[in-house]
Amino acid sequence: MGRGVSVGGGQSSLGYLFGSGEAPKPAINNAPAPSSETLPISADPSPKHVAAQTVNVTKQIPAGINKSSTNNYIRADGQNTGNFLTDRPSTKVHAAPGGGSSLDYLFGGGGSN
């Protein structure tokens, strides 16, 4: 069976692609026409009492933000920086090449001996 061949079940809406030869039928709108009647306006508008809706505060926190995190400070360069995911120390290089190293404890260097 090739493309565009129908196996029953109704008329394909893709006839415009495969050349059915018929124009698509326009959709029929069965919605009632809007009423032109107007509601009477009372001279004494009564105040409507609206119950206050309780809002769940936890639903207002964006995904990925932990409200009890100790690293919850505002960053100028965006929310997805720093140790927001792993709470591990940064691996960013803080010293210039050839300068002091924070890895002296591994390589036995440094110290004032």
UniProtKB/Swiss-Prot annotation:
Q: Which InterPro entries match?
A: SPR1/2/3/4/5
Q: Keyword rRNA processing: yes or no?
A: no
Q: Cite the record's Gly residues compositional bias ranges.
A: 1-12, 97-113
User: Keywords of this protein's UniProt record, alphabetized?
Assistant: Microtubule, Phosphoprotein
Q: Which gene codes for it?
A: SP1L1
Instruction: State the source organism's domain of life.
Output: Eukaryota
> Positions modified as Phosphoserine?
69
Which protein is depicted? Protein SPIRAL1-like 1
Upper taxonomic lineage: Eukaryota, Viridiplantae, Streptophyta, Embryophyta, Tracheophyta
Q: What are the Low complexity biased-composition ranges?
A: 23-34
Tell me which species this is from: Arabidopsis thaliana (Mouse-ear cress)
